[in-house]
Amino acid sequence: MTINFDNATLILEAEGLRCPEPVMMVRKTIRQMADGDTLLIKADDPSTTRDIPSFCRFMDHELIAEDTETLPFRFLIRKGLSA
């Protein structure tokens, strides 16, 4: 199955930002989203490959897809119902 990163409800451009800024921006953006909405994050900080999946697990959001093979890294998250 091919994931279409282009159908996200919102896009967060976090390129050029370094830890912890990308995850802080994700957290702030997700708080403003409706349950079930999707967020595409574009980032180039290597720590996001670890931090964003961990954030999703900890906060009960669904990491639908991630592309960490090329820059910018892309992460597609669905906001969890309990967040």
From Swiss-Prot:
The keyword Cytoplasm applies. Signal peptide: none annotated. One of its GO terms (biological process) is tRNA wobble position uridine thiolation. GO terms for molecular function: sulfur carrier activity. PROSITE patterns: UPF0033. It is found in: Cytoplasm. GO terms for cellular component: cytoplasm. The keyword Flavoprotein does not apply. The active site is at residue 19. Keywords: Cytoplasm. Sulfur carrier protein which probably makes part of a sulfur-relay system. PANTHER family: SULFUR CARRIER PROTEIN TUSA, SULFUR CARRIER PROTEIN YEDF-RELATED. This is Sulfur carrier protein TusA. The gene is tusA.
